[in-house]
Amino acid sequence: MSILFSPAQIGTLQLRNRIIMTPMHLGYTPNGEVTDQLIEFYRVRARGGAGLIVVGGCGIDRIGNAYGMTQLDDDRFIPGLRRLADAVQAEGAKIVAQLYQAGRYAHSALTGQPAVAPSPIPSKLTGETPVELTEEKIAEIVASFAKAAKRAKTAGFDGVEIIASAGYLISQFLSPLTNKRTDRYGGDLQARMTFGLEVVAAVREAVGSDYPIIVRVAGNDFMPGSHTNTEAQVFCQAMEKSGVNAINVTGGWHETQVPQITMNVPPGAYAYLAYGIKQAVSIPVIACNRINTPDLAEAILQEGKADFIGMARSLMADPELPNKAMSGHPEQIRPCIGCNQGCLDHVFRMKPVSCLVNAEAGREAELSLTPTSQPGKILVIGAGAAGLEFARVAALRGHKVTIWEESDQAGGQLILAAAPPGRKDFLHLRTYLVNACRDLGVEIQYHTKATPENILSAVQEGKFNRVVIATGAHPITPPIPIEEGVKVIQAWDVLAGRSKAGQNIIIVGGGAVGVETALLLAESGTLDNETLRFLMLQQAETEKELYRLLIQGTKKITVLEMANGIGRDIGPSTRWSMLADLKRHQVNCLDETTVLEIRREGVLVKNAGTQKILPADTVILAVGSRSQNELYQALQGKVEYLSIIGDAIKPRKVMDAIHQAYNEAIKY
């Protein structure tokens, strides 16, 4: 880690290392005022070793605002911001405020007034048509950027970042998709850059010549007809000439159809965008998006693709990532898995952000893992996500913990979740939990089937004085008539590799498990990455043919869902891309379809009042799960300290299981 942990500068700002916590919308400031929740969240990340923390977005006015956003539009916010700056700086990190104006991405229901934009082009995010900005109003917004920057400086912040990416207001002026103006702010690229340049000039005048200014740009908008990396380089060169001290390079707009930070994006996939900018400018460049490990961060720096590394969700997952890596213990880092369940999905639902893998995220002000005053001997039944997390936290608090696991491996449904394409990061979480338990002295006994008798015997012998049931759930077989001789298997068995499907497959159930199973099977017979790379390098096939070979597998797949819509239980930040993949792989999806019978010749279904047979050689069931709580019921009243966690209570998402297990463990 010779480069990652070396000191570096952005303008006059000296940083202790090259790890930058890039801005995240957290929703921790419901009234715009800095809260203790926000302060403790960032204090912990600063203490964990980050070199720079970028807070944001911070609203420069109310018309371009978002819910729960920290505000910089009035002097009354300065005292709270000063408390935040003091807290971060006291831990050795520096702090920067990101100046935010959403433009057409703002929602009138939140701001109380129509959104504004360079041109009245409807927003795909809000469904609203913004009001076209007058030149007078443009001047007001430019002034608001400057005033907000001045307030950040007055509050003791070490610099400011101007957001010119993600499809927000400056992006909207830059793009020909959203800027149809005929005045000096519209037309060719030079004219469309005018607004952004005016913002930078006004901010520079407000804060002085030696105050650091960063601009966050889209290395590629990933919007057909908008900016590519070529235009981004021209804009960044103009930013450098205007006095900007660093460029923070991210990916596309929020409405792009190219995934940006979901789990299926390969780690470091967009570092090439930062490298393109770095070749065009001489000021420092920050690489972002799915850079989740210190080793990857160091490799990007060693290859000369960037000068700094942006990590946001990685530091939400583990605030101590820098310190653990610097001390030579990267294996102890709790991994961000790119699931988006607690972060981006919560933003879309206008909820405060949390984290699937880190139940403490956003709760730093209220939680403190203190040693227990009464160390116990705890038996946990089941080494799934909930059982492992409970064991980890209980052991941290000083309990002696043993896990009985019936199978030959830990992880439970994390292993199933990792099976579909682009989902392997769930295995990183499994590895972390198993290793953390091992390091804390938790004993996992495999091939150990728990019964009421052997549990009670172990308790009576004094081996354990507390029992936690984490037996999870099992898949449901619905009460559908099934003709003898038909191949009917469970989706869980397909995901686990225990059952093989034929060539003409019907999946009953179009929720998350059904969709994931379909995507796994749809890749059967498609080009693998190594072959694709070889054929591309040799120019052996046309791009069109390579694309066909990449998406066209050897199986015919149909997904049936009784309700309206496919994948309705998948988070909004991920669902759209998974549905797009189903379409790409030509998976046939039928919703509002009831399965009546499963016969040798196929599946009898009813759709829109009409019955028909859908031919199939394999039927896969993905219709939900049921809690396995028989042990808990059998032990009630017989074990003094008995509790139940995770899916054993009620089937739930992994995040809910982990958080509930954590909450239970801190009670012990």
Curated annotation (Swiss-Prot):
Known partners and oligomeric status: Homotetramer.
GO molecular function: 4 iron, 4 sulfur cluster binding; FMN binding; metal ion binding; oxidoreductase activity
Subcellular location: Cytoplasm
SUPFAM superfamilies recorded: FAD/NAD(P)-binding domain (SSF51905), FMN-linked oxidoreductases (SSF51395)
Cofactor: FMN; FAD; [4Fe-4S] cluster
Protein family membership: In the N-terminal section; belongs to the NADH:flavin oxidoreductase/NADH oxidase family.
EC number(s) recorded for this UniProt protein: 1.16.1.-
Pfam families hit by this protein: Oxidored_FMN (PF00724), Pyr_redox_2 (PF07992)
Binding locations of [4Fe-4S] cluster: 336, 339, 343, 355
GO cellular component, one term: cytoplasm
Keywords: 4Fe-4S, Cytoplasm, FAD, Flavoprotein, FMN, Iron, Iron-sulfur, Metal-binding, NAD, Oxidoreductase
Keyword Iron annotated: yes
GO biological process, alphabetically ordered: catabolic process
Enzyme class: oxidoreductase
Function: Metal reductase able to reduce Fe(III)-chelates to Fe(II)-chelates, as well as soluble Cr(VI) and U(VI), using NADH as electron donor. Cannot use NADPH as an electron donor. Is unable to reduce riboflavin and FMN with NADH as electron donor. May have an in vivo role in metal reduction in D.reducens, which is an organism capable of reducing contaminant heavy metals and radionuclides.
Residues bound to FMN: 23-25, 57, 98, 216, 290, 312-313
Residue sites binding FAD per the record: 341, 386, 405, 413, 423, 450
Protein's recorded name: Metal reductase
Species annotation: Desulforamulus reducens (strain ATCC BAA-1160 / DSM 100696 / MI-1)
Record remark: domains: Has an FMN-binding N-terminal domain (NTD), an FAD-binding C-terminal domain (CTD), and a 4Fe-4S cluster between the two domains. CTD is the main contributor to the iron-reduction activity, and NTD and the 4Fe-4S cluster are not directly involved in such activity.
Keyword Transferase: no
The organism's taxonomic lineage, starting at the top: Bacteria, Bacillati, Bacillota, Clostridia, Eubacteriales
